[in-house]
Curated annotation (Swiss-Prot):
Species annotation: Methanocaldococcus jannaschii (strain ATCC 43067 / DSM 2661 / JAL-1 / JCM 10045 / NBRC 100440)
Listed name of the protein: Methanogen homoaconitase small subunit
Motif placement: YLRT: 24-27
SUPFAM superfamilies reported for this sequence: LeuD/IlvD-like
Keyword Lyase: yes
């Protein structure tokens, strides 16, 4: 699988409160959440994103509270993947479960606005406007299967482990 998009660069320790601040947590509408994505850092962020773009960050992306809404806001804003040096563990798991692709890489060479092409199978990121290739670590095994299904709920539905929103198939 190949992902190509423009990089939106952030620094270290981007926490879930910055990704989706508390006052916006009252809604369950994913598109409403997306309209406030990264509001704690850049209120205009959703207007800058084109479908398929990627977030690039430093260390400990998604730290802070375990709010799943942070991942939902990013995904429904149009972001296809987040590339970071490291992730908070709960954010990483929430990303897999929601169908947002977390990628671990040294992000120093990627600048805001660069066009990146990520090859998940080769585990490479090409900064196309610089003709530079960076190795990366992508989800594997069951994590990759869940992502391919579009998230955990879709994965479970395809496996016929859940019938509907009402519960687990017996």
């Amino acid at each position: 699988m190949i992902i190509k998009g423009r990089a939106h660069k952030f620094g270290d320790d981007v926490d879930t409160d910055a990704i989706i601040p508390g006052p916006y947590l009252r809604t369950t509408d994913p598109y409403e959440l997306a309209s406030h994505c990264m509001a704690g850092i850049d209120e205009n962020f959703p207007k800058k994103v084109k479908e398929g773009d990627v977030i690039v960050a430093g260390e400990n992306f998604g730290c802070g509270s375990s709010r799943e809404q942070a991942v939902i806001a990013i995904k429904y804003c149009g972001i296809k993947a987040v590339i970071a040096k490291s992730f908070a563990r709960i954010f990483y798991r929430n990303a897999i479960n929601v169908g947002l692709i977390p990628i671990i890489a040294n992000t120093d060479e990627i600048k805001d606005g660069d066009i990146v092409e990520i090859d998940l199978d080769k585990e490479e990121i090409v900064i196309t406007n610089k003709n530079k290739t960076i190795k990366c670590e992508t989800p594997k095994g069951l994590e990759r299967e869940i992502l391919a299904a579009g998230g955990l709920v879709n994965y479970l539905k395809k496996r016929k482990l859940i019938q509907s929103k009402k519960g687990v198939k017996t």
